[in-house]
Amino acid sequence: MLLKHYLKLHTLPRIEGASIFSSRNNVDLLFHDQTIKVSRKRTDGNFWKIFDFRFLKGRPLTADDEKNSNYVAVINESTQKKLFGNKNPLGAFIELEGQPFRIVGVVPDVPALCDRPFADVWVPLSTAKTKAYLKDGVFGDFNAVVLAQNRADIPLIKKEYSERLQRLDYPVPEPWTYAKGRMETYLEIGARSTLNKKGYLDKTYANKFRIILLIGVFIFILLPTINLININLSRILERSSEIGVRRAFGASTRVLVVQFIVENVLLTLIGGILAFGLSWGILQVFNTVDIIPYKNLRFNFLIFFFGFAITILFGVISGVYPAWKISRLHPVAALRQGAM
């Protein structure tokens, strides 16, 4: 395996650990007279140290399990319920592609959106039917992940990986003449995939992706703000008579502006509360629809708080200009405009 034996990922500086694991494969699982389709993933022992699994029962796969080719397996909660109901599955044997595995652990379902750790059943790498995965090759059915000690160490780790790749003494098969690759964060992987730059591994597209997202969010917020300004201006113009009377009795521009801004913020608060309830309801309904396996969409109150704060800010902005403009009208002009 190129990553493990030639690049020696586990010796990279300032990392907590490195793991190599297979892509997931859909296979038949047999248990007594039951047969179900499951996603299987082969892992090493470090896989369970890098990804944050919570064990409901039993233990994870270990380095010894991989070294000794122990036929043991970890299953998810849904697979346990399908096969065992409320019974304890630890110690029971299941069959995958003709191979018997003893269940040693149970974990909560991993959402399919978490592509790297996701599976229904996890077994040791070394239990593969053939040892072809140990042979040298450029392409394979495996992934690698590295856990940095600190976020600040990521650039150093990437640099060391790139330097090792350049010094690589590896027989690159024809027609290729060199090996090319990079270590990427989830954001960088998503950015390159979204921007259709899958073959461009010489640079990162994360910053470009961030800028595009920020521009999109800005436009998404700006357009409703412009609409709100127009709506507020029309609404306030309808109250020209009221404004004219209040100005005639000595109401200052500041008092009128504050009044209309407060009214606008209150309306925004009501809209935000309605949006909160609607969003929560949609999430509950979406969680009951079996579109994404094992999804568990939860309401993120921190994101909602920031979104709500931005909404209030733009609510204030959309109320300032109309309120300031109408409050500057002469009382007589305001009364005439209201009478028209």
Regions from the PLM with identified roles:
Residues 46-60, 71-201:
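Mid-to-C-terminal secondary-structure elements
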Residues 202-241:
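Hydrophobic alpha-helical transmembrane segments of multi-pass inner-membrane transport and secretion
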Residues 222, 226, 233, 241-287, ...:
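Transmembrane alpha-helical interface segments in multi-pass membrane proteins
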